[in-house]
Structures are given as structure tokens and as C-alpha cells.
Amino acid sequence: MQLFSVISTSTNEEGGCMGKINIGRVILGGLVAGIVADILGFLVDGVLLGSTWNDRMQKLNHPALSSTQLIELNLLGLACGIALVWIYAAIRPRFGAGVKTAIYAGLAVWVVGVLIPNLSFMCAMGLFGRRLAVYTTLGGLIEIVVGAIAGAALYKE
């Protein structure tokens, strides 16, 4: 337990008074986080890795993503951004406001929302190859952490 108490930078004592989460700011910051992550995701997966994704999808006899699927993925990105800023708001009393806490929130979302699914579905099942899995997973890290920083910058209690 000593390790975890060293990581925390909060000056609040356990059971101290915490402010309420500002839901309006969570939504605003979350939408910004989601938009930033979606744009970066397009650059990583659509531009840099687009031909590799298309080749892999063809090998699986799966058509390219439709406009409807792209819209759905972007809506999921917005929902992920809102969840991310909510996590930031929830851990902010313990770690303090700022970039470091936004990075912690981004890492938490990345581990659960990108790393674990990509390891299981892309690597363990061998569907898309390790190279694509590694690149898209590392791209996801950048997308989510940068989105977290942008979204957290708008959050105020």
C-alpha cells in the first residue's frame, strides 16, 4: 500500500470534502476531447495506416467501412471523450488539476478502451497482424492522451 500512497499528490485527507462534478463542463470538455481524439484517429488510422487497414480488411473478406460505420465510430469517440473527462473530474481531487491528472485519466481510458481490446482482438486472435496492432494501439495512446489534455483544460468545478 505504501507504493500507492507515494503516487498520490493530494493534500486532502481521506474523507475530506470534495466538490461536486460539474456535469456541464464534463460534457463540454468531453466533446472537445472526443473531437480531438477523433481527428487524431483519422490521421493515424485513416491517413497513416489506411492502406494497411484496407489490405487487412480485404484479407478477411470484409468491405471497407461505410459512412454509417464511420459516423458510429466518431459518436463512440465523443462518448469516450465524455467518459474520459468524467474520470478526470473524479480523480482531480486526489491528484490535483492539470496536465498530469489529464494524462492519468487518458492512460486509464487507453488501457481499458484501446490496449486491452487490441491485445485481445487484434493480437491474441491474430486478426490484423502484430504490426498494425502495435501501430494503431500506440496511435490510440497519443489520440486519447492529447484528447484528455484538451478536454481537461476546459473542465472547471
Q: Could you say what each language-model-derived stretch is?
A:
Residues 1, 6-7:
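Short hydrophobic transmembrane-like helices used for membrane targeting/insertion
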Residues 4, 12-157:
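Juxtamembrane/disordered regions of integral membrane proteins
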